[in-house]
């Protein structure tokens, strides 16, 4: 499992996907949501699945959405929504983390004054792990 390719959305994303997979891909994880949903269907192969799990595009709904028309034949639409966990669920998660000594991989630490540099490192995707910004001011 995993990704064979990483593509940048440069306004030619669907064309680039179809150049690598002419029949389309089996699954699309849509993080921008309704804003790009119809376009994302174009990247799917027959019987492919589009999963919407975010609204990072800022558009929460699709006006005049008609599933009969807007979901192409032989393609599937599903979603994933993560609601606010209960205190009990959070306690369970933290017990698991502590019990199994799970620790994040920290690539670099920066002071608040170095936040510009931290942002550049994050944007360049050259580090494996978390970029941590520490506020030493009190």
Where do the PLM segments sit?
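Adenosine-nucleotide cofactor-binding segment
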Residues: 1-39
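Short, surface-exposed connector motifs at secondary-structure boundaries
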Residues: 19-25, 45-48, 99-102
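Short catalytic-loop micro-motif centered on adjacent basic/acidic residues
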Residues: 26-29, 51-52, 78-80, 104-107
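C-terminal hydrophobic helical "lid"/dimerization subdomain
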Residues: 86-138
């Amino acid at each position: 499992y995993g990704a064979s390719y990483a593509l940048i959305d440069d306004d030619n994303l669907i064309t680039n996907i179809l150049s690598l997979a002419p029949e389309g891909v089996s699954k699309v994880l849509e993080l921008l949501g309704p804003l790009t949903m119809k376009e994302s269907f174009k990247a799917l192969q027959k019987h492919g699945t589009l999963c919407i799990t975010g609204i990072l595009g800022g558009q929460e709904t699709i006006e005049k959405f008609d599933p009969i028309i807007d979901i192409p034949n032989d393609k599937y639409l599903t979603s994933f929504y993560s609601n606010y966990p209960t205190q009990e669920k959070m306690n369970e998660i933290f017990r698991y983390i502590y019990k199994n000594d799970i620790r994040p991989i920290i690539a670099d630490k920066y002071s608040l004054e170095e936040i510009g540099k931290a942002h550049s490192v994050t944007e360049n995707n050259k580090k494996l792990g978390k970029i941590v910004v520490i506020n030493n001011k009190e």
